[in-house]
UniProtKB/Swiss-Prot annotation:
It comes from Staphylococcus saprophyticus subsp. saprophyticus (strain ATCC 15305 / DSM 20229 / NCIMB 8711 / NCTC 7292 / S-41). It comes from the Bacteria. Manganese or magnesium. Binds 1 divalent metal ion per monomer in the absence of substrate. May bind a second metal ion after substrate binding. The lineage of its organism: Bacteria, Bacillati, Bacillota, Bacilli, Bacillales. This is Ribonuclease HII. The keyword Hydrolase applies. Endonuclease that specifically degrades the RNA of RNA-DNA hybrids. Its EC number is 3.1.26.4. It is an enzyme of class 3 (hydrolase). It is found in: Cytoplasm. InterPro entries: RNase_HII, RNase_HII/HIII, RNase_HII/HIII_dom, RNaseH-like_sf, RNaseH_sf. One of its GO terms (cellular component) is cytoplasm. Residues 72-256 form the RNase H type-2 domain.
């Protein structure tokens, strides 16, 4: 009696490479359901290979540092929240474990909410160290968003349980006594920065969702502080909050 298509589909999931799939006896099974299952599994493996190739490419900066110092503690740093009209700027500093692999990890802006949440859970359970840093709305208004972002990055680094030996920073240079590499669009080039990007994004989004429950009417849970029409309508109807950045337009014009 021939195997059922259901059984074959189950076995195909245990084939972990395209070459293994190509050697499979099921290539000779003429049943349409089997051939469709083969095509589907090939597409899955091709997608997984693309993700793996991208992940390997995003470890190049880390591997270069480790080649010179195998004991290096490499810390990726990124921020989220420079552009919104409300809420703090949040940063994250992350040191990954040596044998890390987080399939699909990328710049948080390129991931869906579901993908970010899944990767966040994996990161929080399997990183060497991480810490968040914040700069408040008051600090943003006092020293400007660029300086406030650097301040928040310093706070994240200081919050780590161990001092890193090399920093990979997204598009900034920090005044700190630790060797560093600044990478433009680093969250798409370095797994360490990408990890920091995801954690910072998820952390700040949760903060803004909590703020949305505290101040209904501004749609913070949807706009995370950005100047959407719903947010602007909320300002017109309910007024400006302490959580609004007074040096950002149109808030600035409304308070003067």
């Amino acid at each position: 009696m021939s195997e059922t298509i259901k059984d074959i589909k189950s076995k195909l999931q245990h084939m972990l490479s395209i070459s293994e799939l190509e050697r499979s006896e099921y290539n000779n099974d003429a049943r349409k359901g089997v051939q469709n299952a083969m095509i589907q599994r090939r597409k899955q493996l091709e997608k997984e290979q693309v993700l793996l190739d991208n992940y390997v490419k995003m470890t190049e900066f880390e591997n270069s540092i480790l080649a010179e110092n195998p004991d290096a503690l490499i810390c990726g740093i990124d921020e989220v929240g420079r552009g919104p009209l409300a809420g703090p700027v949040v940063t994250c500093a992350v040191i990954l474990n040596k044998n890390h692999h987080f399939t699909g990890l990328n710049d948080s802006k390129k991931l869906s909410a579901k993908q970010r949440h899944s990767i966040e859970s994996k990161l929080l359970n399997d990183v060497y160290a991480y810490a968040y840093g914040y700069a408040s709305v008051e600090e943003i208004d006092e020293i400007n968003i660029y300086e406030a972002t650097k301040l928040a990055m310093h706070r994240a680094i200081e919050g780590l349980r161990i001092k890193p030996t090399h920093l990979l920073v997204d598009a900034m240079t920090l005044d700190i006594d630790i060797p560093q590499t600044s990478l433009i669009k680093g969250d798409a080039k370095s797994v360490s920065i990408a990890a920091a990007s995801v954690l910072a994004k998820e952390h700040r989004d949760q903060y803004m969702r909590d703020l949305g429950r505290k101040y209904p009417g501004y749609s913070f849970e949807n706009n995370v502080g950005y100047g959407t029409q719903q947010h602007l309508d909320g300002i017109k109807k309910y007024g400006i909050l302490n959580e609004h950045r007074k040096t950002f337009e149109p808030i600035k014009s409304l308070v003067n």
